[in-house]
Amino acid sequence: MPTSTETPILRGGEWLIQPSEADSVFTPERLTEEHRLIGRTAQDFVVKEVQPKIDQLETKDWALSRELLKSAAGLGLLGVDVPEAYGGLGLDKVTSLVVSEKLAGAASFGATFGAHANLTIVPLMLFGSEAQKQKYLPKLLSGELIGAYGLSETGSGSDALGARTKATRQADGSFLLNGEKMWITNGGFADLFVIFCKVDGDQFTALLVERGWGVKSGKEEHKMGLHGSSTTALIFQDVKVPAENVLSEVGKGHKVAFNVLNFARFKLGAMCGGGAIGAIAESAKYAANRKQFGQPIASFGAIKHKLGEMVVRTYAIESLLYRTAGLVDARIAATPHDANDGSAALAAFEEYAVEASIAKVAGSEALNYVLDENVQIHGGNGYVHDYPAERHVRDARVNRIFEGTNEINRLLIPGMLIRRALKGDLPLIPAAKALQEELLGPPAMPSTGADDGVLADELRAIAAFKNTSLMVFGLAMQTFGTKLTDEQEVLMHLADITMDVFSAESAVLRAQAADAAKSPKASLHADAARVFVNDAALRIDASARQALAATVDGDTLRTMLAALRRLLKVTPINTVAARRRLADATVERGGYPFA
């Protein structure tokens, strides 16, 4: 299913050094009727089949989990990313995003679904041999077999390559697997596992391991949230794995793990966006009906601020997610490939690994804000089990740990950009040098490339954000050189600036597209984009100042701070009025105004 507009192909991270046009990005408003149809299918499945059974799932009824996965299979939801030749739907990544958004309402079952569809089916599709695909995919797609993914260990969470689980080659070519994996979703009842281990001492490798070969599950973990999903240790004691069950190649497990994480981070970001949209609806309805001092609390400015800000942050996340999906689909479409081969999708997600990490971090943190304010709007009712607000908070907390902690992903974002620059895939270094020369020349604002038009001030601000990012990147690379990887605090500030650049530009381009399409909601789109840009300017200024002060001192620091003041001359807007308009539209609709 192609996306409904042609998307020019930017390289990963290229938006950081050049402007983009509104017609170059995919937005939710450009969904086709096919996209919307499968979205409604997923939504109906969640509302009618999963949500009525959430309490039963939280009793650890794994038979029900299996039953629901089979129901999802019957609707084709397990095979969105799988070619038709293997029994899947063979749809685009925009569709995959839409389905992930809708599954956010499935509570714990969303984790069950994700471990099966995203972390078992996807790696098999991308890296499996033809024999492996023929053997396992049909049963995974039907729900006959349930999958799980075993990467983490007690001593190697973020340091995945430090795994101690080992596989010893036998004379017949098979492997004896020994070790233990921790925190495995679906660990209590899955039938097939993607397990990462060391072969011959140091060759990091992925194996497809069947439970029937001797895999044992530990006790169920008592978790903060996601009570309706199974999380256990997996124990391997001389489990014999046939040679043909190596996934990819011996010693290539890192490629499997890291590329699957690119997929998973993007989809986790999508679920976070969908979760935020659902929580906004809960807050809007509660605020409209809850009366204090003789009037609905939705009429109070303090509540309007919360609702408005919930919408602003969700709008930015949704915008960057759909933009990324459009880029991935365009890259796949432009790459000659066999439709039954996952190589094009693999290359596309590798290209946009930075954007996937941004989706994961920004999405999980925006959701955290929205869910926390949802509890606050509910007051005491938000803290009790009778309302879903408290469960949402518990269930969502792990999103900042899943698929690489947010700290790890923050380090990856600038790290990957720098590696791309050093390889010549991203002209970051020449752009930073050119900006430095411009800043050190006679006083004048660096060129922004933005002209007049709708949201022109915001585009000029975003150009300034990009220049700020280049200035800090360039100075940090110049000062620390190869030791920049040791300066994690500076890298974290760079990540925050980078995330705000991508989020802000995605929001503004979407709002411009809405205006160009003469959307009746164009003014609301503009409000959301303007508020986000206004506040991003404050965040970027703070991050840049701290990064600069950690990088240089004395006269050099004073010079760079003066340059920063020249760059970030952003006039504040009336965010109070804009948030009020967004809040009023949210209450009137009874939910997210852009849904």
Regions found by a protein language model. Name each.
Residues 1-105, 110, 127-132, 143, ...:
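Alpha-helical interface subdomain recognition
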Residues 111-131, 157-160, 168-171:
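N-terminal glycine-rich flavin-associated loop
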Residues 136, 162-163, 180-182, 218-222:
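Short beta-alpha junctions and helix-cap segments that line functional grooves
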Residues 143-151:
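A short, Trp-centered hydrophobic/proline-enriched beta-strand micro-motif
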Residues 156-157, 182-188, 398-403:
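Glycine-rich phosphate/pyrophosphate-binding beta-alpha loops
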Residues 174-219:
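A short core secondary-structure module
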Residues 214-242:
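Flexible, small-/acidic-enriched active-site or ligand-binding loops
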Residues 238-256:
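Long, acidic (Asp/Glu-rich), low-complexity accessory segments flanking structured domains
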